[in-house]
From Swiss-Prot:
The UniProt record lists the keyword NADP: no
Alphabetically ordered keywords of this record: Chaperone, Cytoplasm, Nickel insertion
UniProt protein name: Urease accessory protein UreF
Function: Required for maturation of urease via the functional incorporation of the urease nickel metallocenter.
Subunit text: UreD, UreF and UreG form a complex that acts as a GTP-hydrolysis-dependent molecular chaperone, activating the urease apoprotein by helping to assemble the nickel containing metallocenter of UreC. The UreE protein probably delivers the nickel.
């Protein structure tokens, strides 16, 4: 069980109040709404769950774990490798800019808060770009947060942002949003388990195959009316 000081740090990192701009992105959800693939609470929850289990679980979540391990062992070459690999898998300019902006904002906050050792903060400062999984996993290691707990918080924060985007863009009520979040608890846990298995494999079992998400993200770049930056 996570010790209370680490739990407080974890809640801090996963808070929607963390000033990294997650509220301004929908990661293709707004385009899915525009195309009427998402129309109500049921289709919104299905979209978010499928994204967790078939996109996050196969790429971003296992890469997050690999980055956490690299930060723990101070393997800075592997940190750079997985940061660059993840950045290369972002299929559209919107998705690249999203992880760049949020990663840079969190890296800046880490420096200002003095989290971690000098070498780790210097590496975050020098990497261009620094992706969000890289910065978030670094903060977890700096604050003594274990990999599974840190990844669960990362994924729940992602799901929370998706639900908030659905509430605004579908639109949905606040109670419907909370019901969706409750329904996603098991999907978050399942994604963590799948990510651990994929990260533990030799070589890691990673897949970036998500063509519909890539197409919707590209469509969103020229969508006539938008609330979100992705």
């Amino acid at each position: 069980m996570t010790a209370l000081p680490q739990l407080i740090s974890l809640l801090h990192l996963a808070s929607p109040a963390l000033p990294i701009g997650g509220f301004s992105y929908s990661q293709g959800l707004e385009a899915a709404i525009d195309c009427e693939l998402v129309r109500d609470a049921t289709t919104a929850e299905r979209w978010i769950r499928d994204n967790l289990l078939h996109v996050q679980a196969q790429c971003e979540a296992p890469v997050w774990l690999l980055l956490h391990r690299a930060w723990q062992t101070q393997d800075h070459a592997s940190v750079r490798q997985w940061n660059d690999w993840f950045h290369a898998t972002r299929e559209t300019s919107e998705l690249r800019l999203e992880t760049e902006q949020m990663g840079w904002s969190l890296a800046k906050l880490i420096a200002q808060m003095g989290w971690g050792d000098d070498a780790s903060r210097d590496l975050l400062r020098d990497m261009r770009p620094v992706c969000l999984p890289t910065a978030f996993s670094s903060a977890c290691v700096a604050l003594g947060i274990a990999a599974r707990e840190g990844l669960a918080a990362y994924l729940f924060n992602w799901a929370e942002n998706q639900v908030a985007a659905a509430i605004k863009a579908v639109p949905l009520g606040q109670v419907a949003g909370q019901q969706m979040l409750l329904g996603l608890h098991q999907a978050v846990l399942g994604t963590v388990d799948e990510a651990v298995c994929r990260a533990d494999a030799v070589p890691p079992l990673l897949s970036t195959f998500s063509p519909m998400l890539g197409v919707l993200s590209a469509r969103h770049e020229t969508q006539y009316s938008r609330l979100f930056r992705s």
